[in-house]
Amino acid sequence: MPCHSSAAKAKCLADIMIDTHTHIYEPEFDQDRDDVVKRAVEAGVDKFLLPCINQESIPGMKALAQRYPQYCHTMTGLHPEDVHADWQDVLDSMWDKVENPVAVGEVGLDFYWDDTFRKEQIDAFEYQICKSVDMDLPLVIHMRNAEPQLLDAMERHKADGLRGIFHCFGGSRESARRMMRYEGFVFGIGGVVTFRNSRLAQTLSDAVPLDRIVLETDAPYLAPVPHRGHRNEPSFLPFVAAKLAQIYNVGIAEIDNITTSTAQRLFSI
């Protein structure tokens, strides 16, 4: 693979990667979506997993998966910030619109900006946990300012053999150790690990083994250094892999091989 771009240079000694969480179906990519996919593939990203946010996400996700069936896989679910009093009707209307989802996500609890619908968020999350069990699919979990409530909900279903990802993990060592108790779950690590003021590198080194990590971008959000502050995209994933290689003192190829194997096993792709 010729190493023309900075991302490709970071990737030259590495193997195939999977972006387990990317929103490249969103309007931020309308002007250059095909180029975004091309750059990512050239950088070594072999799969793009597309989390569902709400009903409006579905047409774009489906169109992208139909255009790039060899690369793109869709999820189904309702993001906690989109949970309102009518959450049950919303989920009932959208559930069967995503064909062959690889996960239930992006779901969870978020009390950061507004907890008006706190009870509804918890009810919707538990409903979607049950759906994931019924469908034998992993969960992709979003959590912000809600760790005790979210882990309480998961504990009520622990006997169901839950599995999935704690998406965009950026918590403390104590949080990581609590989440490590859920043996079917791994940690989604993205651009935040490259930020100079982030303590995530030390947390991972202290508390999370490499085989419990998968790569993600959360594009268009949270671009890694050296692209911080700009639109994120999957071709930047090598910068995350390179940082993890430093943290775990292994080669980039080993990071890619282990995280890819973990993602393939979790999502059956």
Predicted segments, located by residue:
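Mid-domain alpha/beta scaffold segments of enzyme catalytic cores
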Residues: 2-269
